């Protein structure tokens, strides 16, 4: 039985970080440290099998999209900070319960309006800049908002926890656009659609997690849903997989599967196929082996790890940082608040190192990354030959599993 890589929430606060280097508590010092981190010669501790020892792989989380108007988990306006009782739906609950799916899709229906209005911010576009200059070779993201693909489609990006832009049928495995699914939900739930129009579309900006909104009863979550306490979730309807409805699959015992819908095409209890699920890794669900292997290879092929906007609370992300550390890779972390097990990543650094061996800072990624890119561009224009620092082996990179999955 495959071990489930749980997205463990760690709702409690993590210990505060120790800023590294010590002068990186100022914006100027932090930019200098990150510049040194990205331009330093490859670590001598790296194993001989590293494909591109001068390259950097990025590992990103919900904090990166806060400036886009989305919620994170543990920031000052994060889900776990403002709503201590928050509990996500688990994969086994989604599979087993028609009522649980009604609640999930009702909340997702409201949350999709927020996500649709939002888009990449300056941090995402700065990552494009790092890629264009040759500093970033690939991105591993825990985020499901697709902002990386919009901001830098040419930079290989592995979506570790999937994405919200599509759904997958649990029976026939066909995929459906989330935009098309949203239109169907509006048709099946006209009262909810009117509520959505009045409450969300009439606003100029996306709903954000604030104390005021929590008082009103609204709260947004990083995985793209909105909680409205007291809402009649049991009245919500969601469609069956259109492919399964037209061509019911055979069950394992050789009988044709049963799929019942109401007069409008909504899935009815008693059906045993045709359940649509978001193309994300839910809490308690296993990450696909090919995605797990591609993430490991992205780490193994690079010489540095830059962690952005994540506390690494999920095991699937933390294990990648741990893998990088075990392989002798320098690690830099930009995140507000503590990071899971971060003392293990930095305990062996020399006190007088200036960032080349590791960096730990607390700044908004939307603030520091654009200035980091500007500083690197200024150094480039001053005559520094980055090709002596960056030496990517393009032909070998074309053959790695990350590229295979993304192609």
Write out the residue ranges for each language-model feature.
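Conserved catalytic core of sirtuin-type NAD+-dependent deacylases
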Residues: 1-407
């Amino acid at each position: 039985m495959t071990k489930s890589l749980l997205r463990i929430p760690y709702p409690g606060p993590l210990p505060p970080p120790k800023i590294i280097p010590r002068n990186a508590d100022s914006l100027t010092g932090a930019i200098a440290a990150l510049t040194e981190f990205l331009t330093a010669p490859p670590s001598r501790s790296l194993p001989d099998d590293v494909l591109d020892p001068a390259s950097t792989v990025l590992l990103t989380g919900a904090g990166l999209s806060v400036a886009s108007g989305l919620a994170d988990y543990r920031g000052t306006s994060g889900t776990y900070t403002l709503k201590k009782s928050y509990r996500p739906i688990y994969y086994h609950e989604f599979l087993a319960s028609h009522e649980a799916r009604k609640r999930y899709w009702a909340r997702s229906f409201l949350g999709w309006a927020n996500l649709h209005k939002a888009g990449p911010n300056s941090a995402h576009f700065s990552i494009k800049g790092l890629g264009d200059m040759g500093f970033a070779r690939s991105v591993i993201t825990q985020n499901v908002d697709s902002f990386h693909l919009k901001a830098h489609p040419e930079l290989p990006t592995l979506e570790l926890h999937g994405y919200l832009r599509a759904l997958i049928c649990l029976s026939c495995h066909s995929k459906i656009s989330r935009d098309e699914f949203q239109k169907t939900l509006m048709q099946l739930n006209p009262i909810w659609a009117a509520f959505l129009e009045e409450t969300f579309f009439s606003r100029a900006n996306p709903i954000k997690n604030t104390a005021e909104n929590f008082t009103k009863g609204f709260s947004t979550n990083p995985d793209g849903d909105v909680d409205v306490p007291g809402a009649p979730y049991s009245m919500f309807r969601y469609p069956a997989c259109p492919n399964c409805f037209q061509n019911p699959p055979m069950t394992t015992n050789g009988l044709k599967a049963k799929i019942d819908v109401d007069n409008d095409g909504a899935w009815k209890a008693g059906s045993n196929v045709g359940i649509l699920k978001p193309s994300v890794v839910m809490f308690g669900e296993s990450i696909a082996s090919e995605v797990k292997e591609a993430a490991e290879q992205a780490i193994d092929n690079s010489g540095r790890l830059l962690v952005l906007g994540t506390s690494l609370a999920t095991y699937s992300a933390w294990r990648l940082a741990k893998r990088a550390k075990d392989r002798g890779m320098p690690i830099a972390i930009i995140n507000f608040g503590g990071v899971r097990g971060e003392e293990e990543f930095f305990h062996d650094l020399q006190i007088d190192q200036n960032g080349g061996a590791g960096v730990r800072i607390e700044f908004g990624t939307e603030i520091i990354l654009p200035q980091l890119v500007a500083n690197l561009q200024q150094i480039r224009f001053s005559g520094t030959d980055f090709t002596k620092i960056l030496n990517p082996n393009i032909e070998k990179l074309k053959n790695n599993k990350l590229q295979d999955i993304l192609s």
